[in-house]
From Swiss-Prot:
Pfam families linked: NAS
InterPro entries recorded: Nicotian_synth (IPR004298), SAM-dependent_MTases_sf (IPR029063)
Keyword Flavoprotein attached: no
GO biological process, one term: nicotianamine biosynthetic process
Signals that turn on the gene: Is part of the operon cntOLMI that is negatively regulated by zinc level through the Zur repressor, which leads to transcriptional activation of this operon under zinc depletion. Highly induced in response to airway mucus secretions (AMS) treatment.
Name of protein: L-histidine 2-aminobutanoyltransferase
Organism: Pseudomonas aeruginosa (strain ATCC 15692 / DSM 22644 / CIP 104116 / JCM 14847 / LMG 12228 / 1C / PRS 101 / PAO1)
Keyword Metal-binding: no
Family from the record: Belongs to the methyltransferase superfamily. CntL family.
UniProt cross-references to SUPFAM superfamilies, sorted A to Z: S-adenosyl-L-methionine-dependent methyltransferases
Amino acid sequence: MQGRTPLLETLRELECEIRLLTVYARECCGCYEILRRKLDRLSGLIGEDCSRAQWQADSDDPALQALGLRLRDAAVQALCELEKHLCQGVLHEPGEMGRYLGSLLESIRGELDSAGIDADARVLFVGSGALPTSALVLAREVGAHLCCLDIDEEALGCAREIARCQGLEARMQFSSLPPAELAFSRDATHFLIASLVQQKSAVLAQIRQVMRADAKVLLRHGSGIKGLFNYPVEPAELDGWRVCAERVSQPLYDTLILEKAGR
């Protein structure tokens, strides 16, 4: 019990602070910077060896697991709000955003190489959000064509404006329609499902209906302590799919590369 108290208490404090700051930031923009630092703190904890070891040691503790679920919900909501706020700054400094995107290319290089994403790729990105950095990198640095999906119309509006400011309108389109209702889905070479998408099995089922036989799915997810900031994928959700490349591990999330089983 003594070994788990520091992590439990730290996560409890973070959950409370993140929830309060998310509310306060809607009234006072100055709170967004504090909120960003709290989310950075959570990201840092996830990457710390001692935190990972402590989480693993106490993984069966119901109190820790329940807190983890609450913290994840708070963090996901906070990140969505923060991205919309950050979007305004990005629109005023398009040059800075361009340099930032260039620096991000190496961080997703493992996913690109494992899935075979290049300039000829057509990628449907599910759960792209207001600040779809991965999609922007693929369009700007790789030259791929993308369709970004999100159920949040406000987030789509933000992302659309960023794409316009970066001169990427010809390579990026945006929609709130389900994957099964998009013509783009039938021609897509790749499907990228964001780690913040909760209903991964439902999205996979829709994609399966319309995807071409040789298309691949990049499924970002979080398990263990990475689940504090990302939704997991359960083994049963992968029925009918085959893992076709080695899992790509990032500090905050992991990526499975999938194709239809029985090809």
